[in-house]
């Protein structure tokens, strides 16, 4: 982001902190191209890198300079000359430019707040999503109730733009942003359809993720305000994420908003043992206290979304359950708190007592049905879990086919290695193994049995089941008892920051 700072300082010297002129600068789109070129190989870019050229950028900027081309026809936006014949391509370029420009001031604010707090090093530790699981193991065993909440979606994009205007004071920039969103999403109705939102998010991932994350950050900042008001304990771990939007400077305004929007005064309560975890569009609220207090938090969330963000949320979509009797889905796992009962014999003098001890343990299970559904969607098996061949990969070499299957199996094995029960994982690996064999047999136009007998590939395909043991043998001594003990325990790969589509099935 150093080049971001340089370009923003250059723009500040010309225009007084306005973002609007940056949209017409070629280097902004060069930064967007660099971001697309350097991102993960697992993410498809939809041909953006192949079609990008400086000539196309100059042509797009020229079109935007011609103000008569910015007039939108509400009846038929597809004929708008602003986009010409390459509407999808130009919209993708300009959305990347919008994302780069709007991220600059927020990144600079976040960097300054992190430097002042001297927590740059600790901030890097929160990159891994797998840090959630050790947190669950440490905290959730002491809690009793959990509420599985899905954040309301979709939200009207006009509300997102209005929320963003609170923090960036540049009216021309937001007029152009609103014009772009209006033209692409076709805002002829009050609420855009899920199909239009989905299309917008897939072709413009960076801008969509920024707007959506900003909406989530705004709602979580208000939730943090309620949480701090309801308890004497401050959430130190949350302060890093909310200082970037200057939340504490907005506290007095929030009090006025709540007093106007809510029909009654919010009766705050003391609940120091509440924990909040969010990933993607879901969040989990867990507490040690009685369900009455959890119901209060449930209504706070509903009224917050309805009054502050104009998003309708049904009370029945938020369920409150006991952790010992309910499994909640998070990060591709099914998790619950299992009660382990044991009886201890105690003797005092000549009297003998039987004492029943109940201990809690976080039970994390591999969800077999969602994984089979994902494998069926990727054409590795049918909906019943029966392996099928992958004819699309038949043009590759035998080594490449086996390596592709092994890579998927390796990712799944690493991701779900922390589960307490691995039988479901072994079944998934078995499906991938047979699918690989059938793909190779299909390529060589043979049956599975004849192919294995002729090529002797059975030993090679044993890597699907022996690879994890070989990895552990590099870390721990090659001792059968040691490996067996570690296979029974959980090993979290905390350096994994990317999960493929097969494990991201929520």
Swiss-Prot record:
GO biological process, one term: mRNA processing
Keyword ATP-binding: no
Task performed by this protein: Usually encoded in the trnK tRNA gene intron. Probably assists in splicing its own and other chloroplast group II introns.
Alphabetical keyword list: Chloroplast, mRNA processing, Plastid, RNA-binding, tRNA processing
Entry's family note: Belongs to the intron maturase 2 family. MatK subfamily.
Entry GO MF terms: RNA binding
InterPro entries: Domain_X, Maturase_MatK, Maturase_MatK_N
Any GO CC annotation of this UniProt entry: chloroplast
Compartment(s) where it occurs, according to its Swiss-Prot or TrEMBL record: Plastid, Chloroplast
Species in which this protein is naturally found: Trifolium spumosum (Mediterranean clover)
Organism superkingdom: Eukaryota
Descriptive protein name: Maturase K
Main location: plastid
Keyword tRNA processing: yes
């Amino acid at each position: 982001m150093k080049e971001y700072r340089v370009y923003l300082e250059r723009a500040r010297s010309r225009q007084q902190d306005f973002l609007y002129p940056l949209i017409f600068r070629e280097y902004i789109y060069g930064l967007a191209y660099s971001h697309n070129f350097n991102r993960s190989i697992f993410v498809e870019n939809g041909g953006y890198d192949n079609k990008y050229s400086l000539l196309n950028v100059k042509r797009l900027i020229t079109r935007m300079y011609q103000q008569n081309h910015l007039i939108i026809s509400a009846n038929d936006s597809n004929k708008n000359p602003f986009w010409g014949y390459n509407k999808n391509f130009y919209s993708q370029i300009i959305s990347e430019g919008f994302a780069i420009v709007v991220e600059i001031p927020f990144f600079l604010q976040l960097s300054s707040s992190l430097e002042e707090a001297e927590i740059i090093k600790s901030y890097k530790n929160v990159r891994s999503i797998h840090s959630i699981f050790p947190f669950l193991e440490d905290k959730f065993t002491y809690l009793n109730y959990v509420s599985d909440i899905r954040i309301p979606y979709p939200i009207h994009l006009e509300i997102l733009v209005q929320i963003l205007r609170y923090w960036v004071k540049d009216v021309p920039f937001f007029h152009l942003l609103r014009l772009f969103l209006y033209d692409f999403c076709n805002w002829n109705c009050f609420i855009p359809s899920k199909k239009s939102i989905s299309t917008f998010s897939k072709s413009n991932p960076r801008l969509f993720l920024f707007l959506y994350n900003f909406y989530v950050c705004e709602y979580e900042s208000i939730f943090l305000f309620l949480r701090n008001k309801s308890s004497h304990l401050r959430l130190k771990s949350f302060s890093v994420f909310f200082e970037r939007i200057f939340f504490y400077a907005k506290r007095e305004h929030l009090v006025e908003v709540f007093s106007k929007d809510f029909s009654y005064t919010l009766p705050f309560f003391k609940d120091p043992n509440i924990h909040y975890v969010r990933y993607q569009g879901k969040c989990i609220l867990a507490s040690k206290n009685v369900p009455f207090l959890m119901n209060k938090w449930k209504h706070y969330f509903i009224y917050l979304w309805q009054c502050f963000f104009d998003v309708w949320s049904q009370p029945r979509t938020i369920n409150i359950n006991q952790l010992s009797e309910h499994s909640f889905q998070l990060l591709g796992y099914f998790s619950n708190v299992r009660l382990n009962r044991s009886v201890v014999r105690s003797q005092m003098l000549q009297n003998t007592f039987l004492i029943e001890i109940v201990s809690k343990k976080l039970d994390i299970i591999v969800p077999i049905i969602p994984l089979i559904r994902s494998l069926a969607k990727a054409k590795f098996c049918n909906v019943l879990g029966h392996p099928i061949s992958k004819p699309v990969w038949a043009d590759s070499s035998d080594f490449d086919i086996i390596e592709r299957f092994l890579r998927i199996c390796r990712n799944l094995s690493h991701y779900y290695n922390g589960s307490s029960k691995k039988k479901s994982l072994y079944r998934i690996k078995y499906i991938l193994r047979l699918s690989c064999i059938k793909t190779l047999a299909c390529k060589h136009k043979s049956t599975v049995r004849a192919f294995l007998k002729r090529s002797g590939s059975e030993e090679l395909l044993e890597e699907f089941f022996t690879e994890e043991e070989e990895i552990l043998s590099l870390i721990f001594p090659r001792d059968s008892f040691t490996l067996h003990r570690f296979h029974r325990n959980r090993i979290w790969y905390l350096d994994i920051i990317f999960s493929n589509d097969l494990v991201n099935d929520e």
